[in-house]
Design a protein with these regions (language model features):
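Histidine/cysteine-enriched polar flanking segments
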Residues: 1-241
Length: 241
């Protein structure tokens, strides 16, 4: 097994081959159970955790499960996207401690953090960050909000993603970016080749020098994002499994 100090947070429902791939590359896997929210999303990492920054600078903010409620909007307070340059969420419902942590990390990294308000409260579920300014989403409202800033957005067709208990899931919830062997890798849960916009997605990543790994043993499935902590210290006490 390769040496790696990074921890990956993902649902225990993630593809077995994806989990084996991550473990074989030395990532420590951590899954959550959040009984405060409804069962279909209770294993989703992005309901309780928020990744601040990308790649080698990624750090995990651990939310307080006692602040969460079963239904929307009480279950979205941590479901934000923070690339380091941008903090994207429905700011009406963002947890104040999360926002303060994002601002503190940006200051520590000598980065100016731009906050972008979107109507979609399940922001991380709906938005897959590719780099500091590049994103993939099927949500036209998010795409419109990001277009007002220095961003590149690939707007894909909605649907074609499995999510148990719902008609379909969302692209943000299928994956996440990891640093691996000096490269930047986007990992996706399930066979993304089945998505009708797969070729556009692959080209979007290739143009940004991002490698792609996906598991073909399962359908493309929203598992509540794949989040990585590449930093040596957590921002809060870690959540127990």
């Amino acid at each position: 097994m390769l040496q790696n100090t990074s921890t990956v947070y993902l649902s225990r429902l993630a593809s077995p081959s994806l989990q084996r791939f991550l473990q074989s590359n030395g990532f420590q896997l951590n899954s959550l159970d959040v009984p405060a929210v409804y069962p279909e999303i209770s294993t989703h990492a992005d309901i309780l955790l928020c990744q601040l920054g990308l790649w080698e600078k990624a750090q995990i903010f651990h939310g307080d499960p006692e602040k969460l409620a079963r239904n929307y909007p009480g279950n979205i307070r941590y479901n934000a996207v923070c690339t380091g340059k941008y903090f994207i969420h429905n700011l009406q419902y963002t947890d104040s401690d999360l926002l303060a942590a994002a601002e503190a990390k940006a200051a520590a990294d000598s980065t100016i953090l731009t906050k972008i308000h979107v109507k979609q409260g399940y922001t991380r579920c709906s938005l897959l960050p590719v780099d500091d300014r590049s994103f993939i989403t099927s949500d036209a409202g998010i795409a419109k909000s990001l277009a007002c800033h220095d961003t590149d957005v690939l707007l894909i067709r909605p649907g074609h993603i499995h999510l148990p208990g719902f008609d379909y899931g969302f692209i943000g919830g299928t994956g996440g970016g990891l640093p691996l062997s000096g490269r930047r890798l986007l990992v996706v849960n399930g066979n993304i080749e089945t998505h009708p916009d797969y070729k556009k997605i692959a080209t979007f990543l290739e143009d940004r020098d991002i490698d792609l790994y996906y598991s073909k043993d399962r359908p493309l499935m929203d598992i509540g994002s794949i989040l990585v902590d590449a930093a040596p210290k957590p921002l809060q006490q870690p959540v127990r499994d």
